[in-house]
């Protein structure tokens, strides 16, 4: 992934980006869950084994936070940062201790703003994938992206 700063005008439908990786540990899962999603199957190995997950699983919100980190640190370097305007998220399967995640993203839509000519709306589809090639999260995000000065 190039570290070139990208403006709305630089992007094309079909452009793709791949991030670096992030390894998830059991301690990470429990630490995040203790603060933000304190459900037994995220906090306790025994409770997790007896849950529908059959073992310790990261909160979906933890997976989403990892995805955001990977996009910000290794995804497309957007001129104004990653400014979200909504989207849809689906968790396809649990993120487990030891998973090594990366994100693959594709530009699926670009719409110049009619009312604010200094920006446009980017629809970016990002799949968070583990070391086995399995999609653990699917995110379609609408992002506000700055245009180049006229």
State what each model feature region is.
Residues 3-13, 91-150:
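HotDog/MaoC-like acyl-thioester-processing domains
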Residues 52-58, 62-109:
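Hydrophobic beta-strand-centered segment that forms part of the acyl-chain substrate-binding groove
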Residues 41-43, 82, 87-88, 121, ...:
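Short, intrinsically disordered/low-complexity patches at protein termini
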Residues 1-58, 147:
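Catalytic strand-loop segment that frames the active site of acyl-thioester-processing enzymes
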Residues 5-7, 24, 38-40, 71-78, ...:
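Short secondary-structure boundary micro-motifs
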Residues 36-37, 49, 82-83, 120-122, ...:
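Short, charged/polar low-complexity linear motifs in solvent-exposed/disordered segments
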